[in-house]
């Protein structure tokens, strides 16, 4: 039967997963009976009890007991085990919690002290292995204990001098309770200092060895802490209990109380502990919160001054009290011996502060010798404390705003410089305004600050400081983030005043500029002017071509710019060749828009096209960059064009029916901006519009065109809204893809050929050579309306009568000289016509070549009514006179 008992025990241990005693009993070879004896279980337990109680410890043994008895026998030991395990688990939990309180916690302060969470865990293991009741100096328990000690010390240092000085009866129950409690707490603190780890000042190592801690404390602050913690009230309570009350009163009558008062003053040595604890808290606040540390220092300084004044006031009254108020003391002279303690304390405090601030002697000048010496001592201490207070307060206030102080010192030097050179008043005012806008009252050594940081943090700060510039620049929005970061790290902040020339014509270009805030005007030899606003950049063409500037840029308002030197420019673009091609593409487009070209850029661009450097993704990025660069252009009408009218209002009021009547049937494969449309007056209004500064995306509001017909889908779009140009581009791109897939035979039939005017060229429907070159390589047809030598969309004038107009496919260079025609016919007629005009001119390519002839039949002749000679752009002999002027080679 014994052999059968062991398997049953093993099976029961498997059923009871939370119990370890069955397995231990089986492992040691002891039988179930031995286990039952240890647990006090009566024999005869059954198996039913083991099944009913999963957390109980029951063993099945062979015996004559019944099932019910076995079940009852199994329940009794289970209850006894749980009753014993509950307090044990609770005690273990409390012990673990208290032990964790003695270890450094994972918080902001400990992470800053030790560096990482793993280092904090390692320090916790050190505390566990250091010994019993070793307290870590950065533990939570020590933190809260120091807070309690700080409150107790402040209370003692304030209440004890008042009680000793102004209260003669010191045997009252509240006073005894306060002193006994204070002495008890300070004795506990004295004992805990022997078990608290210390910090080695030389190596910043935390010492947790109990022997080393004890020796360090005995050599440092033990004597002072022990004297300040002497339980004086315990001694007097013991003496009072052992002596007869009459004898005790007689002893007091014999002025033993004077000794007790002087002995109680030893508690004021607890000030040393207060200073130590305040210093620790200053370090904690400094490492955790920089601003809070400054506030703590201010309150600490003010509190120490008030505490010294409080002590000095109590001392002023204590000395006459110990002398039983002689007739020549200040208390007797002011007749305040029997006054209330509040009045006595007020006069004493006033007298002490008058001495310490060296402003007088208080209510009564010193007469007795003791008052005289106390007054001199008070003056010396007060003068020293006052000097320390002023020095600390001045340094603290200056440290709170050091950048503004540096700015003031710098500007004082500037004022002395202006006075030394006797600069005029207007120039001094400009210098003053520059410093105000450039530094805004604060000066930082930003270069040294950024150089002291690591690379990721420096890049993050630069990106944050230039976030507004990046948000307003389409070039950065479509660029690689690494390129943007590399570019921003090379920028230098500059400020220009209204009227300052940022760049001058003919100067060698050494910088390019990015406008963060402000408006700048581009000044060229022609009358056309252009405004640059937030997000614009200029001056890059000189850095690419190493040439001289052909235009000047002048600040119209205060401009906050970022400049980039030529060396940094080339350094960044060497690492990002795709962005160099983007700058070159924009430069070619800008030069082409003003009718100029640069052979270096064109040769390099053509070489890239021939070698197939561009891929589809880069083509899309370049298209977006060129598109946004055109939208950033802000043209200003010249003064000598009074016929410039508000085309925006005309096109916005045109009805859809009139727009449908004015559309012409021919479909154009490639179009360009008509210069006659830029300056031709609207039929509805003839009032000239003054020049205005527009937003970067509202170029069409300055030079606005009527509704136009999409050249590939015969759909009408409107240009009146500020974003109309962008909308038309987005609408046109998918339609061009559909047009590309259609056969050439699907185009509408052109009108029959008509005889041409002598001397004029045959109209042709042409495709620009540079655009064709892009198409023959990897560029798609969406690039064609945005090519470097071709404006974005066609423009036409909206009128009430619709007649077809011949399409001119020649370049500006091939426009013939005006010839005499039959009166009333052709464009050379005298009267101003209201017939709609569609004059679509191809520009000459950037390379100077004429686009090829596609063999399109010529259009019918113009109607009888024609425009006057002076208002016709087609008859202008000077093709450059009507070209829009844009900034080039800045």
Swiss-Prot record:
Task: Report the glycosylation sites.
Answer: 338
Q: According to Swiss-Prot or TrEMBL, what is its membrane topology?
A: Multi-pass membrane protein
Domain note for this entry? The segment S4 is probably the voltage-sensor and is characterized by a series of positively charged amino acids at every third position.
Q: Where is the composition biased (Gly residues)?
A: 62-77
Q: Where is this region: Disordered?
A: 1-93, 644-692, 725-796, 845-890
Give the source species: Homo sapiens (Human)
- Annotated gene: HCN1
Chain's role = Hyperpolarization-activated ion channel that are permeable to sodium and potassium ions. Displays lower selectivity for K(+) over Na(+) ions. Contributes to the native pacemaker currents in heart (If) and in the generation of the I(h) current which controls neuron excitability. Participates in cerebellar mechanisms of motor learning. May mediate responses to sour stimuli.
Q: Could you give a single Gene Ontology term from the biological process aspect?
A: apical protein localization
Question: How is activity regulated here?
Answer: Activated by cAMP, and at 10-100 times higher concentrations, also by cGMP. cAMP binding promotes tetramerization and formation of an active channel. Compared to other family members, cAMP has less stimulatory effect on HCN1 because part of the molecules already contain bound cAMP and form homotetramers when cAMP levels are low, this inherent tetramerization in HCN1 results in a weaker response to increased cAMP. Inhibited by Cs(1+), zatebradine, capsazepine and ZD7288.
Q: Which reaction does it catalyse?
A: Na(+)(in) = Na(+)(out); K(+)(in) = K(+)(out)
Name the residue ranges with Low complexity bias.
8-34, 644-691, 731-749
Q: Where is the composition biased (Basic and acidic residues)?
A: 880-890
Q: What is the effect of changing residue 275 to T?
A: Found in a patient with childhood focal epilepsy; uncertain significance
Protein family membership: Belongs to the potassium channel HCN family.
Result for mutant: residue 391 to D = In DEE24; results in absence of hyperpolarization-activated currents; reduced amount of protein at the cell membrane
User: Can you tell me which residues bind 3',5'-cyclic AMP?
Assistant: 539-540, 542, 549-550, 590, 593
Q: How does it assemble?
A: Homotetramer. Heterotetramer with HCN2. The potassium channel is composed of a homo- or heterotetrameric complex of pore-forming subunits. Interacts with KCNE2. Interacts with the SH3 domain of CSK.
Q: Name one GO cellular component term.
A: apical dendrite
Q: What is the effect of changing residue 157 to V?
A: In GEFSP10; uncertain significance; reduced current density; affects channel gating properties as the half-activation voltage is shifted to the depolarizing direction; neurons expressing mutant channels show increased excitability
Name assigned to this protein: Potassium/sodium hyperpolarization-activated cyclic nucleotide-gated channel 1
Start-end of intramembrane regions? 345-366
Pathology noted in the record is:
Developmental and epileptic encephalopathy 24: A disease characterized by early-onset seizures, intellectual disability of varying degrees, and behavioral disturbances or autistic features in most individuals. Generalized epilepsy with febrile seizures plus 10: An autosomal dominant neurologic disorder with incomplete penetrance, characterized by variable types of seizures including absence, tonic-clonic, febrile, focal, and eyelid myoclonia. Some patients have normal neurologic development. Others have mild-to-moderate intellectual disability or autism spectrum disorder.
Q: Could you tell me the keywords of this UniProt record?
A: cAMP, cAMP-binding, Cell membrane, Disease variant, Epilepsy, Glycoprotein, Ion channel, Ion transport, Ligand-gated ion channel, Membrane, Nucleotide-binding, Potassium, Potassium channel, Potassium transport, Sodium, Sodium channel, Sodium transport, Transmembrane, Transmembrane helix, Transport, Voltage-gated channel
Q: Cytoplasmic compartment: which residues?
A: 1-142, 195-215, 282-295, 393-890
Where along the sequence does the record place the motif called Selectivity filter?
A: 358-362
């Amino acid at each position: 039967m014994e052999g059968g008992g062991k398997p049953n025990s093993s099976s029961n241990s498997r059923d009871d997963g939370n119990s370890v005693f069955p397995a231990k009993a089986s492992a040691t070879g002891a039988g179930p009976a031995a286990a039952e004896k240890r647990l006090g279980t009566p024999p005869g337990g059954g198996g039913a009890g083991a099944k009913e109680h999963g957390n109980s410890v029951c063993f099945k043994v062979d015996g004559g007991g019944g099932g019910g008895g076995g079940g009852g026998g199994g329940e009794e030991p289970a209850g006894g085990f749980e009753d014993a395990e509950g307090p044990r688990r609770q005690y273990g939990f409390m012990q673990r919690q208290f032990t964790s309180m003695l270890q450094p916690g994972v918080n902001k302060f400990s992470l800053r002290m030790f560096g990482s969470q793993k280092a904090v865990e390692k320090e916790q293991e050190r505390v566990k292995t250091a010994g019993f009741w070793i307290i870590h100096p950065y533990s939570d328990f020590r933190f809260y204990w120091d807070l309690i000690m700080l409150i107790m010390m402040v209370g003692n240092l304030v209440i004890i001098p008042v009680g000793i000085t102004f209260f003669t009866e010191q045997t009252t129950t509240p006073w005894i309770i306060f002193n006994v409690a204070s002495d008890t707490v300070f004795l506990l603190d004295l004992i805990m200092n022997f078990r608290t780890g210390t910090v080695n000042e030389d190596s910043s190592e935390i010492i947790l060895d109990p022997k080393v801690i004890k020796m360090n404390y005995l050599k440092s602050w033990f004597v002072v802490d022990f004297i300040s913690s002497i339980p004086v009230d315990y001694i007097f309570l013991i003496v009072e209990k052992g002596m007869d009350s009459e004898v005790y009163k007689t002893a007091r009558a014999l002025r033993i109380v004077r000794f007790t008062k002087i002995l109680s003053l030893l508690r004021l040595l607890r000030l040393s502990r207060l200073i130590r604890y305040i210093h620790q808290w200053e370090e904690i606040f400094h490492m955790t919160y920089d601003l809070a540390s400054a506030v703590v220092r201010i309150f600490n300084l003010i509190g120490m001054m008030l505490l010294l004044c409080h002590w000095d006031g109590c001392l002023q009254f204590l000395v006459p009290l110990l002398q039983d108020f002689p007739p020549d003391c200040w208390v007797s002279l002011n007749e305040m011996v029997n006054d209330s303690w509040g009045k006595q304390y007020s006069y004493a405090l006033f007298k002490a502060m008058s001495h310490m601030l060296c402003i007088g002697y208080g209510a009564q000048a010193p007469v007795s010798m003791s008052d005289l010496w106390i007054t001199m001592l008070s003056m010396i201490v007060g003068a020293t404390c006052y000097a320390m207070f002023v020095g600390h307060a001045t340094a603290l206030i200056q440290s709170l705003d050091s950048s503004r102080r540096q700015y003031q010192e710098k500007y004082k030097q500037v004022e002395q410089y202006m006075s030394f050179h006797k600069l005029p008043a207007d120039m001094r005012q400009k210098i003053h305004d520059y410093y105000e806008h450039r530094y805004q009252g604060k000066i930082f050594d930003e270069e040294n600050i950024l150089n002291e940081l690591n690379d990721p943090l420096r890049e993050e700060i630069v990106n944050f400081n230039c976030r507004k510039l990046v948000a307003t620049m389409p070039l950065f929005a479509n660029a690689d983030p690494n390129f943007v970061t590399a570019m921003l790290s090379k920028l230098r902040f500059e400020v220009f005043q209204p009227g300052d020339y940022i760049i001058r014509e003919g100067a060698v270009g050494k910088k390019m500029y990015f406008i963060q805030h402000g408006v700048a005007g581009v000044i060229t030899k022609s009358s056309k002017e252009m405004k640059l606003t937030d997000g614009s950049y200029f001056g890059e063409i000189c850095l690419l071509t190493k040439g001289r500037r052909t235009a000047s840029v002048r600040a119209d308002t205060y401009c906050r710019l970022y400049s980039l030197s030529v060396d940094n420019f080339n350094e960044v673009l060497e690492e990002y060749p795709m962005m160099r091609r983007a700058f070159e593409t924009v430069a070619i487009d800008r030069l082409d828009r003003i009718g100029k070209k640069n052979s270096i850029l064109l040769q390099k661009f053509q070489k890239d096209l021939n070698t197939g450097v561009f891929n589809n993704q880069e083509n899309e990025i370049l298209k977006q960059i060129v598109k946004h660069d055109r939208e950033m252009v802000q043209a200003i009408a010249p003064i000598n064009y009074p016929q410039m009218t508000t085309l925006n209002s005309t096109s916005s009021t045109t009805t859809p029916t009139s727009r449908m009547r004015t559309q012409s049937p021919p479909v154009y494969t490639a179009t360009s901006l008509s210069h006659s449309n830029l300056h031709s007056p609207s039929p509805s209004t003839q009032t000239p519009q003054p020049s205005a500064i527009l937003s970067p995306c509202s170029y069409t509001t300055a030079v606005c065109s009527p509704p136009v017909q999409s050249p590939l889908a015969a759909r009408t779009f409107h240009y009146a809204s500020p974003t109309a140009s962008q909308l038309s581009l987005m609408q046109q791109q998918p339609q061009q893809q559909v047009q590309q897939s259609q056969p050439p035979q699907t185009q509408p039939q052109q009108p029959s050929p008509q005889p041409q005017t002598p001397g004029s060229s045959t109209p042709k429907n042409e495709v620009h050579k540079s655009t064709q070159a892009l198409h023959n390589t990897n560029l798609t047809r969406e690039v064609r309306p945005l090519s470097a030598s071709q404006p974005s969309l066609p423009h036409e004038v909206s009128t009430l009568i619709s007649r077809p107009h011949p399409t001119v496919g020649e370049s500006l260079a091939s426009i013939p000289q005006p010839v005499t025609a039959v009166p009333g016919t052709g464009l050379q007629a005298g009267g101003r016509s209201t017939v709609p005009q569609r004059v679509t001119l191809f520009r000459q390519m950037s390379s100077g070549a004429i686009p090829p002839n596609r063999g399109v039949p010529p259009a019918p002749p113009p109607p009888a009514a024609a425009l006057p000679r002076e208002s016709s752009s087609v008859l202008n002999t000077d093709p450059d006179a009507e070209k829009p002027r844009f900034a080039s080679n800045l």
